[in-house]
Amino acid sequence: MIKSTNEIRQGFRDFFVNKGHQSVSTGSLVPHDDPTLLFTNAGMNQFKDTYLGTEKRAYTRATSSQCCVRAGGKHNDLDNVGYTARHHTFFEMLGNFSFGDYFKREAIGFAWEYLTVELGLPKDKLWVTVFDEDLEAEKIWIEEIGVDPKCVLRIGAKDNFWSMGDTGPCGPCSEIFYDHGEDVWGGPPGTAEEDGDRFIEIWNIVFMQYNRHADGTMENLPKPSVDTGMGLERISAIMQNCHSNYEIDLFQGLIKKVAEVTGASDLEDKSLRVVADHIRSCGFLICDGVMPSNEGRGYVLRRIIRRAVRHGHKLGAKDIFFFKIYDELINQMGDAYPELSKQRLFVEKILRREEEQFAKTLDRGLQILDNELDHLEGQVIPGDVVFKLYDTFGFPADLTADIARERGLTIDEAGFDKAMAEQRKRAQQANNFGIDYNKTLIIDQKTEFIGYETLQGAATVTHLVVEGAFVNALKEGDSGQVILSATPFYAEAGGQSGDAGKLILNNGVFVVTDTKKSGDAFVHSGYVGMGSVKVNDKVHAEVDTARRQSIALHHSATHLLHAALRKTLGEHVTQKGSLVDADKLRFDFSHFEALSADSLSEVTFLVNEAIRNNYEVVTKLMDIEEAKSSNAMALFGEKYDEMVRVVQMGDFSTELCGGTHAKRTGDLGLFLIRSESGIAAGVRRIEATVGSAADQVISELLYEVDKACGLVRGDHVNLGEKIEQLVDRSKLLEKEVAELKAKIASAAGANLIDNAIEINGVKVVIANIEGIDPKLLRDSVDQMKNKMQSGIVVLATVAADDKVSLIAGVSKDLIKKVKAGELVNLVAGPVGGKGGGRPDMAMAGGNNPAALADALALVAPWLSERL
């Protein structure tokens, strides 16, 4: 009966492929264009538009093993991970789906056959629930499948009726449970003991047969569908005779690795489960492009990492450890998900860097928390304490709650939320947002795009829009948007800028400045340059050819750059964003550190070599799964149709792309990197240019080089040598100037000592030194203290920009009476500043030189009271 988790995953897919289902790869953990979801949390998420009827697929049956995350947002299992047998932040959902193909009879039959024949589970161990009004499903289970009627339970809508939202597709569901036997406590679903571990839900079959309207009424769908989900970890536990998901082969391998790297000896410690669970969600999220940050999905990832690190320290980890477990994750899941191996270097680097950052404050934060708990009255940690740990030491509130839970305490969530709200209010800045009419505009039309084949064509004006409202006509000088029946204008997508050009009419010209999409309609923005435009007018659309061609060259360059980066830095490099314009490209990609000069040189060489090879740029239409299996690069977070456009440039680059491109790579002429920088944790940006735009950049650079040659009296051959000589000479002069200033300061100090005053037997120097470098004040004070042996010095100077610099020095024998920090702040206050330092030396600044004389006059009376 025992099967490995990997065998079950593959066997499930094979079973349904043999039943005529299309095997579909897991969708991204980051849902595309679905603001209702923080992370993908069910197998049906990637098919949502198919169920809604807004997306057509080439098949009507599908099967998948979907990676899911439930942490943060509405669906959040984070707090329970490690404390229960079946809660995880990351899990896999096995599923089979029907889009208007088969329905209840086949879905129930497939599930029963898989469980009892393919897996060999005893039939008397399986119980079933049905929606209490779904007599059809009940009849199938009892009369056709042969399940004992006492094992078929009717359950209400709360647990056995599923809906996508308040409106839309919905329907009853049927759940299958496994009975672990009388030795395990718990009762059947629907009873008071249902939360026990005896009866475990393993499969949920949803029958989407209704469409719910806003008024609550429901009507039958013309083509009912099926959505099913079975947790891989749960069915693996049953097949491996385990009562906890954490006892299955996959988790046992991870738990042993956690124990190894942390030095833990008790393999039953709950913290081992926490860390083993968290390496899965963290590894997969980073592979899917999520980076640790302080907001949104990135903050959820950061919370999970920090929770894992804290539990690792509980286990005894003394050094950075979390990234070391990733290797075991690859061992356990790398065959099913090759991306884990491809991005190994990148993921480990991100995990290590994040842990190192948190480790700096973890111990101190725990000390603060322990101190607060020692003085805590009651069982609730105050919200302001929770906020302090978050704001100062980076403790997410749920991490503090986790620690509190271990000690039988809770946190004041309302108080924490209030403190957070007050911080946001303090940090809030006024922002003005323009209205994006393309997002508010609803145009029930599909524009035919002809721009791959031609840059001009005839069309009819179907809609005119001004500031989000439909109009019938635009006159000369009016700005607005034009929607056509067909267009050669490419609409902004995939980072490529929208086309510009003209719409020529019999009685006018509309100048197109940009093109975007609204649904399936292409929206041409611009103004009427001459005459007028009316709905139903015939137009001749002409794209700005030179601009389009330049954009196409830069778009092709992003593909070559992407490939070159992966060849140079590793396969962890993936595109995170891009901007393709007529005169430049901007390419964002995943990488953990700045590129060295050698790496940039290698990338540039590889791209230009591909340009010199003059590869033909070939485009093909392919099935999405076929394209992925051919190793065509798919962009993170991008949603693709079933038929995709694949752009290939020799054997150098193959990507899924709907943009416009050069005909051959040689058309790019020359590739030149302008800059490389970091824009976020783990994300770098390259700005570059090709073609005539690159020629222009080189011309400008040569002009600057010629100008530099003239200034240093050199030429292109010895320019570097001349500049080095100039820099060396400058450093020598700077050193001489510094030495002269030091001598002047020393002399000034000697003169000041001669004029020192005495206050109660103590030598005191108070002076405003004009023209001295503020950096030399400290040296002057040190020299004066050494010469006086016992005394107090207060010096000030005003720079050319009216900035006041202050310093106070107190000899060691006097610091019990006078603290340098208190003294310097006495003077700093009137000049609009403050400072600090050691008891014997402190510095401050200010911005009100007019008050300096009065401020220095405060020193003597103040010292008289203390000496």
Swiss-Prot record:
It is an enzyme of class 6 (ligase). Binds 1 zinc ion per subunit. It comes from the Bacteria. Its EC number is 6.1.1.7. Its cofactor is Zn(2+). It catalyses: tRNA(Ala) + L-alanine + ATP = L-alanyl-tRNA(Ala) + AMP + diphosphate. Zn(2+) binds at H555, H559, C657, H661. InterPro entries: aa-tRNA-synth_II/BPL/LPL, Ala-tRNA-lgiase_IIc, Ala-tRNA-ligase_IIc_anticod-bd, Ala-tRNA-synth_IIc_core, Ala-tRNA-synth_IIc_N, Ala-tRNA_ligase, Ala_tRNA_ligase_euk/bac, DHHA1_dom. GO terms for cellular component: cytosol. One of its GO terms (molecular function) is tRNA binding. Keywords: Aminoacyl-tRNA synthetase, ATP-binding, Cytoplasm, Ligase, Metal-binding, Nucleotide-binding, Protein biosynthesis, RNA-binding, tRNA-binding, Zinc. NCBIfam families: alaS (TIGR00344). Catalyzes the attachment of alanine to tRNA(Ala) in a two-step reaction: alanine is first activated by ATP to form Ala-AMP and then transferred to the acceptor end of tRNA(Ala). Also edits incorrectly charged Ser-tRNA(Ala) and Gly-tRNA(Ala) via its editing domain. This is Alanine--tRNA ligase. The gene is alaS.
